Regions:
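Interface amphipathic segments
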Residues: 1-305
Length: 305
């Protein structure tokens, strides 16, 4: 898949009826940073303990440890099925220099289904909690609960940088039939929502997965109290590698358009009213529309304000 590795080692030993394996590698990230990965596993009879460590080499730290104990067993009958119980152990991870606690939780693997019982990653006044089933039936759902999760963290992890979004998201993501006809519905409130570093206010966002688009159709109402209101509808599609958003602006900060006006204007500040369509492939987004604006800006070609 184009991922580059600097080096890798694998060592396995079978001592005193215990199998030990160690794996080490360094992965080159797109930014040029190096991500170091290490896996240690010990297996004895029907039990295996696994520890995964990782860390980067940049000024901002991303790293940590995942640890779990897995017990394997088979069902009774003529066609026994291999199953597994996984106890996630308490550890810590570091995201953007912030320490997060992974709390004890339980997972079970049964006939191609994964049961998740209260998987929790948290720090003061922030958490991500997962409960439910990863399976192929429409009635099988998995709930992801968020509290004050930084939107930018999530987008950095999935390497989405076509548009810069930020803010602290609280709400629920409902995933169904994950292994077959995947559906997703979400309702999030985002505090201090910003687009392209332009603060837009408090956002109420609903979204649903669209199979044909291979992406999310969304609707958002964003307000700065007694100052502005912005209504957004459209979609973001990883499958099509593009987006199409209709923005109804009422005294909305013009800062959200800054990246698309580079080379024409700079130091752009002010408010806009009207309709803007932001659309196109992620790597070549364009905008069009009709707006009225009260702005201050530097005209680069004239070097004047």
């Amino acid at each position: 898949n184009g991922t580059r590795y600097e080096s890798a080692t694998l060592l396995c030993e079978n001592l005193e009826e215990e199998l030990k394996c160690q794996a080490r590698t360094s992965m080159l990230m797109g930014s040029g940073a190096m991500l170091n990965l290490a896996l240690d596993a010990k297996a004895n009879q029907d039990k295996m303990k696994t520890v995964i460590n990782w860390g980067n080499n940049t000024d901002v730290t991303y790293g940590g440890q995942l640890s779990a104990v897995t017990r394997f067993f088979k069902t009774d009958g003529k066609k026994p099925i291999l199953q597994a119980d996984i106890d996630v152990l308490p550890t810590q991870i570091i995201l953007n220099d912030s320490v997060w606690n992974i709390r004890p939780s339980h997972l079970a693997l049964d006939s191609g289904r994964v049961f998740i019982d209260n998987f929790l990653v948290e720090r003061p006044n922030q958490y991500l909690r997962i409960d439910g089933k990863v399976a192929d039936k429409e009635t099988d759902s998995c709930l992801v609960n968020l509290k004050n999760i930084d939107v930018k963290y999530v987008l950095d992890i999935v390497r989405f940088d076509a548009v810069e979004f930020s803010g602290q998201a609280t709400g629920v993501v409902n995933l169904k039939s994950i292994l077959k006809d995947f559906t997703m519905n979400t309702h999030l409130n985002v505090h201090n929502f910003a687009e392209n570093s332009g603060l837009m206010g408090e956002a109420d966002i609903t979204g649903a997965w669209d199979h044909e688009l291979g992406g999310v159709r969304l609707e958002a109402q964003i307000e700065e109290e007694n100052l502005s209101a912005t209504h957004v509808t459209g979609y973001v599609s990883p499958k099509l590698k593009g987006l199409d958003l209709m923005i109804d602006a009422d005294s909305t900060s013009i800062a959200l358009l800054n990246p698309y006006l580079e080379g024409i204007f700079s130091d752009l500040n002010g408010r806009v009213n009207g309709f803007v369509r932001l659309h196109g492939p992620f790597k070549a987004l364009d905008f069009e529309g009709k707006v009225s604006a009260a702005i201050d800006a530097k005209v680069d070609v004239l070097n004047t304000y």
